[in-house]
Structure formats: structure tokens, C-alpha cells
Amino acid sequence: MRDVMDLYAPFVGRTLSGEELDQAREILAAQGFSHTLGIVYDEVSIDKVVAHLDVRPELCQPMGIVHGGVYTSLVEDVASLAAWWWLGGRGLAVGSSNSTDFLRPVTEGRLIATATPLHRGRTQQIWVVDIVRKDGKRAAQGKLRVANLPMGTPDDE
């Protein structure tokens, strides 16, 4: 984990654009589960993170619509990055609660996720993530509660 955080260090806490955003995308794309889902980051700042993923058959459940776990994972990924980005390297942002509502079915196309802060405090943050489909209609909405932990927090005590 420390290696990944060191890679992010030059970028954290700032709005990224151009070449910096491309460099950060390369780092983010290398992250295991995010890479498996195909999450691509389009905008990263301390007040908003936007990402997308293209729907493909392996992300769908047997009825042919996007699996609920994809939405939940997208909420977790985008909001976690947003929370950590806002901390600006002052600690770790660790998800503690994820509540995602599935509103409309999606069978194909692109999902766009936008994370914005509802609350940012000393010990916790809450981020709302709206996920829209290609026609602009909301497909899902999630809320991630994040614990702000000091750097070097042990896994268990």
C-alpha cells in the first residue's frame, strides 16, 4: 500500500488535468479490482471525482442487466479516491459503510459516476455518488461513509 501512496504523492490534494491526469490514470488503472471492472477516471479534484466504465457482458447478471455489485464497487472506488484526495496525504481514507440504490436497469453503454462530498470532517467523510447512464438518467446512487485514519494505522489491534 505504501508504494501506491508514494506514486500518488505528487498529485494528491490538487485538481488534475492534461498530462498529470494521464499519469494518475496510469497509476489508477493498475489497481487490481478497479482495473478488472474497467474504471477510468475522467476528473479528479478535492471537490469532485468523475469516472466511467463501459458495460460489457461479464459485468451483467443472468437477466442481462448490470450486476448490483458493479454499482456498489463503482461507488466505493470513486468515493474512496475522492475522500483520500481531499485528505491530501494527511491520512488514510477507509470505507466503513456503503449504501447503494439501484434505480434503473442498464444493459449496455457507459456508466458515468460522479462523487461529491456531503460531509468532510476530522474523523469521517460522507460522499454521494451519482451514476448515470448514456441518456443522462440516473441508474444508481450511492453513499459511502469513510473513516479518516492516521497514516500507519495497523490492520487490527
Task: Name what the model sees in each region.
Residues 1-157:
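Terminal targeting signals and extreme-terminal segments of soluble enzymes
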